[in-house]
């Protein structure tokens, strides 16, 4: 193994160890049980193989700094639609639940509502966290379901809570960049005929220190959208 291979291997294992926690281990076991060892190994390789083009430096170069975020908070749009963010939640680890909610509270665009359908009625700790935030900010709405309805049922329950002009879906362990809703509303102000806005996405480590595996989506292409690609 040459020095380059050693370095790459070190990065792979270092990244893997950095992402290991009870939640990711549990998800890994579920994936292994559902898809089998072959698909699990392919997935593991995809997640931890080194990036051909480093994403971290690009990300750091393009994220808005504190001054830009403050400028966005003061900006007045002519059109200020309410955006509902629907979240189906089920046995969400507290660290991810708090990070997800905080990412909404950190938005530079203020006219949003967070609609959480809680499918874990037996999880008193999770209910306490949700009550803590919903009592603090009226934009955070929680519906405690009588039982877990599954991902589809919980999602539909969250969607029924939405009262905004636009609705977005967010997984219970996902985050929004602080300027995410601002950029969406900026685009809606540029073209009032828009019905749908889609965005790029990436993954982030549990401690939020490293962004990786970006999914940078192309401009809208009707032929591509309707193809099997």
Spans of model-derived segments:
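N-proximal low-complexity "stem/linker" segments adjacent to membrane-targeting elements
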Residues: 37-102
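Short alpha-helix within the catalytic core of nucleotide-sugar-dependent glycosyltransferases
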Residues: 101-102, 127, 156, 164, ...
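Acidic donor-binding segment of Leloir-type glycosyltransferases
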Residues: 105-144
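Glycine-rich, basic loop-to-helix element that forms the pyrophosphate-binding segment
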Residues: 145-162
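Short aromatic/hydrophobic "clamp" motif used to bind/position activated sugar donors
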Residues: 167
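The conserved acidic donor/metal-binding loop of glycosyltransferases
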Residues: 171-175, 200
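Conserved donor NDP-sugar-binding/catalytic core segment of glycosyltransferases
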Residues: 179-211
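Conserved small/polar residues in nucleotide/adenosyl-binding loops
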Residues: 225-229
């Amino acid at each position: 193994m040459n020095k380059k291979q050693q370095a790459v291997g070190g990065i792979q294992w270092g990244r893997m160890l950095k992402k290991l926690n009870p939640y990711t281990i549990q998800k890994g076991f579920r994936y292994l049980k559902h898809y089998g060892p072959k698909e699990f190994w392919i997935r593991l390789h995809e997640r931890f193989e080194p990036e051909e083009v480093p994403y971290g430096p690009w990300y750091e170069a393009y994220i808005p700094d504190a001054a830009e975020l403050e400028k966005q908070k003061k900006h007045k749009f002519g059109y200020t639609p309410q955006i509902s963010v629907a979240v189906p939640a089920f046995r969400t680890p507290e660290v991810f639940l708090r990070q997800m909610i905080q990412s909404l509270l950190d938005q530079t665009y203020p006219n949003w509502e967070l609609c959480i359908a809680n499918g874990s009625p037996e999880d008193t700790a999770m209910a306490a966290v949700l009550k803590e935030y919903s009592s603090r900010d009226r934009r955070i709405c929680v519906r405690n379901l009588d039982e877990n309805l599954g991902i589809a049922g919980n999602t539909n329950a969250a969607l029924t809570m939405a009262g905004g002009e636009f609705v977005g879906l967010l997984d219970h362990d996902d985050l929004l960049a602080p300027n995410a809703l601002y950029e969406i509303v900026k685009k809606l102000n540029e073209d009032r005929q828009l019905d749908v806005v889609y965005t790029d996405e990436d993954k982030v480590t549990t401690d939020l220190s490293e962004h990786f595996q970006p999914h940078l989506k192309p401009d809208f292409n009707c032929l591509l959208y309707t193809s099997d690609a």
